[in-house]
């Protein structure tokens, strides 16, 4: 039912060029579901139509989508440039230091700013498992990321959110903005900023304590200290 959709589905990622995608986006938007562009080859007109239909966010920006490219003797804008030109569209960055280089992180921050840029781990079940053996023969953990065993491509991230904040700071992003992109901005994009994303009265007490090197010293979820995270005392 409509209530079930609104309560159980918060976000849907799709390629806007797929048949029926724009109509589906309009329906989801009418139910309060966030619709995100994902794994697409859409150029400007396609992204413009997608945004107008309800695709207001971009999943895993730069990954699974082309940038400026050439076809024979002609040159075309890609999804990346089209998203930059769509002022109201928000983005997310897999800022693990591997999926995107520091220069791209700075560019995205400069053009979309902290209000429209959030950080996402895209972490697999192997998050924080660097150096550990895994049972899936198709993937390997190497260089702080999950790769296809044949080294043909990245398979996913193993980063946790603190890694993303450190990576952004190392890339030259102000700490305050890096933290906002990991808290306030994603909460607002997801429509849960009435209870998440800030340390304020009557909001959920989800708190991280970091040291000067931005390593986690303690974590609270809904006001409860997370087991085995407290290294403050």
For each of these PLM feature ranges, what is it?
Residues 75-93, 109-121, 126-210:
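His/Asp/Glu-enriched, well-ordered alpha-helical/loop segment
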Residues 213-220:
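Short, Lys/Arg- and Gly-enriched loop/turn segments at beta-strand edges
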Residues 6-129, 147:
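Active-site core of metal-dependent hydrolases
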Residues 1-5:
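Short, small-residue-biased leader/transition segments that mark boundaries at the very start
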């Amino acid at each position: 039912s409509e209530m079930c959709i609104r309560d159980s589905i918060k976000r849907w990622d799709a390629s806007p060029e797929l048949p029926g995608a724009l109509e589906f986006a309009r329906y989801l938007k009418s139910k309060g579901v966030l619709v995100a562009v994902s794994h697409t080859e859409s150029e400007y007109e396609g992204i413009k139509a997608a945004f107008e239909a309800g695709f207001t966010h971009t999943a895993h920006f730069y990954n699974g989508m082309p940038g400026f490219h050439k076809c024979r003797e002609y040159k075309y804008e890609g999804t990346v440039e089209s998203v930059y030109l769509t002022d109201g569209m928000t983005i997310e960055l897999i800022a693990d230091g591997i999926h995107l280089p520091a220069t791209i992180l700075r560019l995205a921050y400069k053009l979309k700013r902290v209000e429209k840029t959030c950080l996402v781990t895209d972490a697999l079940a192997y998050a924080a498992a660097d150096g550990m053996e895994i049972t899936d023969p198709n993937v390997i953990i190497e260089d702080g990321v999950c790769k296809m065993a044949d080294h043909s491509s990245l398979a996913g991230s193993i980063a946790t959110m603190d890694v993303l904040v450190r990576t952004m700071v190392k890339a030259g992003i102000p700490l305050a903005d890096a933290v906002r992109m990991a808290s306030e901005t994603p909460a607002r994009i997801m429509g849960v900023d009435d209870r998440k994303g800030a340390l304020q009265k009557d909001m959920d007490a989800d708190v991280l304590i970091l040291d000067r090197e931005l390593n986690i010293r303690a974590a609270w979820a809904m006001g409860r200290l997370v087991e085995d995270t407290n290294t403050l005392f």
